[in-house]
Swiss-Prot record:
Keywords, alphabetical: ANK repeat, Cytoplasm, Cytoskeleton, Membrane, Repeat
Protein name, as recorded: Ankyrin repeat family A protein 2
Coiled-coil regions listed: none
Membrane topology, from the record: Peripheral membrane protein
One GO MF term attached to the UniProt entry: protein kinase binding
Subcellular location: Cytoplasm, Cytoskeleton; Membrane
Protein source organism: Bos taurus (Bovine)
Subunit structure: Interacts (via ANK repeats) with CCDC8 (via PxLPxI/L motif); mediates the interaction with the 3M complex which is composed of CCDC8, CUL7 and OBSL1. Interacts (via ANK repeats) with HDAC4 (via PxLPxI/L motif). Interacts (via ANK repeats) with HDAC5 (via PxLPxI/L motif). Interacts (via ANK repeats) with LRP2/megalin (via PxLPxI/L motif). Interacts (via ANK repeats) with RFX7 (via PxLPxI/L motif). Interacts with AHRR. Interacts with NEK6.
Role noted for this protein: May regulate the interaction between the 3M complex and the histone deacetylases HDAC4 and HDAC5. May also regulate LRP2/megalin.
Lineage of the species this protein comes from: Eukaryota, Metazoa, Chordata, Craniata, Vertebrata
Disulphide-bridged cysteine pairs: none
Length: 313
């Protein structure tokens, strides 16, 4: 299990921050990060393609997994911001048209299109934006640059590049290949919510039981973000629902910490032990209460009541 220094979530959980913005310091993040963004987190860069850098943590720390969740949620906020910017741009054009305001581009100014993950829901650095490539509008279909060879099998899995991933696996037999931290393509895909990739990897021989150097599992990574579809696929493969990592974090504790109600319920129904405690003495119920997650607390309470009723019978 963990040392007390790694998993100390006592009164600090309640006093320092509210549940909605709660985060714990010191967690090396798992995230897809663009080159302009700051990257002070620990971990090794796996590669850069079209301005994208992949970072893995040296250890997956239960105490600060909220920062991992927050980093993966950044994409959602970027999508919202892009929609707002798009709406403002359209409104501006319509306003100028209604007022007969004629504008012309400033001389000497070149417009450079920057593609980010928020450009499309399933962004890929090796795919051009197809926003203006509808055939019925007379636009030409953009071509995909041949950059697949510059990406590792782990990056392909994280991005959901099924075609290139399948080709790479067939040619090199790297379906269970581990990176410097012991992470497999399946773990990368699970951490980034790539449902189709996870299903493909499992169907083609990926081992869901493999653990990272810090005993990180694909199940724990999926639970920390609440990817219930991926969690279900992994549970159906018979993975250990109570597998703990280097600091005592279990899939259930990660799901509770992320306030993922459906995921918590699914884990409990599949044998997750709610009484397992961290090194500092906190179990899943204690953690839910400390973070103020009432829905999660109710799910755990209901499960415990059922267990007690079964014992009486």
């Amino acid at each position: 299990m963990a040392t007390s220094a790694n998993l100390d979530i006592g009164a600090q959980l309640i006093v320092e921050e509210c549940p909605s913005s709660y985060s714990l310091s010191g967690m090396p993040d798992i995230k897809i990060e663009h080159q302009p963004d700051s990257s002070a987190e620990e971990g090794s860069a796996q590669g850069v393609a079209m301005g994208m850098k992949f970072i893995l943590p040296n250890r997956f720390d239960m105490n600060v997994c909220s920062r991992f969740v927050k980093s993966l949620n950044e994409e959602d906020s970027k999508n919202i911001q892009d929609q707002v910017n798009s709406d403002l741009e359209v409104a501006s054009v319509l306003f100028k048209a209604e007022c007969n305001i004629h504008t012309s581009p400033s001389p000497g100014i070149q417009v450079r299109h920057v593609y980010t993950p928020s450009t499309t829901k399933h962004f890929s650095p090796i795919k051009q934006s197809t926003t203006l490539t509808n055939k019925h509008r007379g636009n030409e279909v953009s071509t995909t640059p041949l950059l697949a060879n510059s990406l590792s099998v782990h990056q392909l899995a994280a991005q959901g590049e099924m075609l290139y991933l399948a080709t790479r696996i067939e040619q090199e037999n790297v379906i269970n290949h581990t990176d410097e931290e012991g992470f497999t393509p399946l773990m990368w895909a699970a951490a980034h919510g790539q449902i189709a990739v996870v299903e493909f990897l499992l169907q083609n021989g990926a081992d869901p039981q493999l653990l990272g150097k810090g005993r990180e599992s694909a199940l724990s990574l999926a639970c920390s973000k609440g990817y219930t579809d991926i969690v279900k696929m992994l549970l159906d493969c018979g993975v250990d629902v109570n597998e703990y990592d280097w600091n005592g974090g279990t899939p259930l504790l990660y799901a509770v910490h992320g306030n993922h109600v459906k995921c918590v319920k699914m884990l409990l129904e599949n044998g997750a032990d709610p009484t397992i405690e961290t090194d500092s003495g906190y179990n899943s119920m204690d953690l839910a209460v400390a973070l103020g997650y009432r829905s999660v607390q109710q799910v755990i309470e209901s499960h415990l009541l059922k267990l007690l009723q079964n014992i009486k019978e």
